Swiss-Prot record:
Annotated Gene Ontology cellular component terms: cytosol
Domain of life: Bacteria
Protein name in UniProt: UPF0149 protein XCC3260
Disulfide bond residue pairs: none
Organism: Xanthomonas campestris pv. campestris (strain ATCC 33913 / DSM 3586 / NCPPB 528 / LMG 568 / P 25)
Alphabetical list of InterPro entries matching this protein: YgfB-like, YgfB-like_sf
Family as reported in the entry's similarity comment: Belongs to the UPF0149 family.
One protein family per Pfam: UPF0149
Length: 180
């Protein structure tokens, strides 16, 4: 299942008077789901920690984003993708979106996983690396082609880190439960 485009998510976000970008919303959702948070229609209120937040419209871009994200995280072919910026966005906008995504991921993950989730050693390292990325900014990059390549590598690292954390907190416990 494909993610909706960034413009559609941004449009619905503005309709709900949200100050969050598409990258932040997707990052928070991914963190929530990867930390073991429930796949439910009220996910937005949960990641924003705002019980008064209205649930996204069923079938709207935010709901499609939730459904696609759940499907991608559960996909055995590792088809998970990050929703960051529109194609062709300048490097500083793409780097800021990635780092915003990481900050939101950590927030959603913390809300869902609580104090000390049971993580593998690799999961602990991945979470620490995501925290370091969340502290970065586009000022750490130039506009050179090599920085474009570096950003693509960081995006791939983040994608794999999310799948690892989802595996530790969701897939692993689910598998162990089936064995019992």
């Amino acid at each position: 299942m494909d993610l909706p485009d960034v413009a559609a998510v941004q449009h619905e976000s503005r309709q709900l008077d949200l100050a969050s970008s598409a990258a932040e919303l997707h990052g928070g959702l991914c963190g929530w789901l990867s930390g073991g948070g429930a796949d439910s229609a009220d996910w937005l209120a949960r990641i924003l920690a705002d019980t008064a937040q209205v649930a996204p419209a069923q079938g709207g871009a935010l709901d499609q984003m939730r459904q696609a994200t759940v499907a991608q995280l559960e996909d055995r072919d590792f088809a998970f993708e990050l929703l960051l910026t529109e194609d062709g966005a300048p490097l500083p906008a793409r780097t800021d979106a990635l780092f915003d995504w990481c900050r939101a991921f950590l927030g959603g993950f913390g809300l869902a996983a609580q104090q000390r989730p049971a993580l593998s050693e690799e999961g602990e390292e991945a979470l620490q690396d995501l925290a370091r990325l969340a502290q970065a900014s586009s000022d750490d990059f130039d506009t050179a082609e090599e920085d474009d390549t570096a950003l693509a590598e960081i995006e791939e690292f983040v994608r794999v880190a999310v799948l690892l954390l989802h595996g530790d907190c969701v897939m692993g416990p689910r598998f162990r439960q089936r064995l019992n």
